[in-house]
Design a protein with these regions (language model features):
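Beta-strand-dominated extracellular/periplasmic modules and repeats
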Residues: 1-228
Length: 228
């Protein structure tokens, strides 16, 4: 039987079409450094570390935010398909107009006073998470002429130590901007589909919100691309 090798699904440090990588990609070979005990110890997140309301990004204001409300569910799994419980998941995103409430965001789009675009949730004992939000809008960026970022949600995952933080992005099915987005295209072809959520109407709320499902795998041949 021929030996098989796992397919690398993670983006390279340098992807010239994504201009920021030209500045931050390492110019020399990486040097492996053994982690210190402080980096590998803790945190252990208790069940009450995050309040339930922090996973609902639509309840920060005095009224509902503008945009297409959605419910996003999924599981955090290891390479053997086992759940990763009590992992801290942080999310952040633009509002429905494609605007971040950040001083460096100069996109000529309105802010939504009822939407801050950030939240967090702890996975349960089965590795499950649930986030309520609005679908983010696309927005222009100056990476290349006529550049627009597709709708996406940023994810940050914390394991059982601060040295185990992983960052990635989730995208939406059928978005035509994916084909011209250098960040998405920097991911090897085998990994791109792993970054796209599935429409799952049963997870939505009748006449209120669409449902999406997106599972994350932290290691192994089915790993979700990280560093996106």
């Amino acid at each position: 039987m021929a030996e098989t090798h796992p397919v690398d699904v993670h983006p390279p440090y340098l992807y010239p079409d994504y201009k920021s990588t030209r500045l931050r990609a390492p110019a020399q070979p990486l040097v492996r450094v053994a982690p210190s005990p402080l980096e590998t110890a803790g945190p252990v997140f208790p069940k009450r570390f995050v309040g339930e309301s922090e996973a609902d990004l639509t309840t920060w204001g005095t009224s509902a935010p503008l945009g297409e409300k959605m419910v996003l569910v999924g599981r955090l799994l290891d390479e053997d398909g086992r759940p990763v419980p009590r992992a801290l998941i942080e999310v952040w995103q633009a509002n429905a107009s494609g605007k971040y409430p950040h001083p460096v965001d100069d996109h000529d789009a309105p802010l939504d006073p009822n939407f801050l675009g950030k939240g967090q949730v702890l996975t349960d004992d089965e590795g499950r998470y649930r986030v309520v939000t609005v679908k983010p809008g696309a927005y222009p960026w100056q990476n290349h002429p006529f550049g627009w970022r597709p709708a996406h949600i940023h994810f940050s995952l914390f394991g059982n130590s601060y040295a185990q933080r992983l960052i990635t992005q989730m995208f939406f099915p059928g978005d035509p901007l994916l084909a011209i987005d250098p960040i998405f295209q920097s991911v090897p072809e085998a990994g791109r589909k792993l970054l796209i959520a599935d429409l799952d109407l049963e997870q939505g709320i009748e006449c209120v919100a669409l449902g999406y499902r997106w599972d994350l795998v932290v290691r192994g041949p089915r790993a979700t691309p990280m560093g996106v």
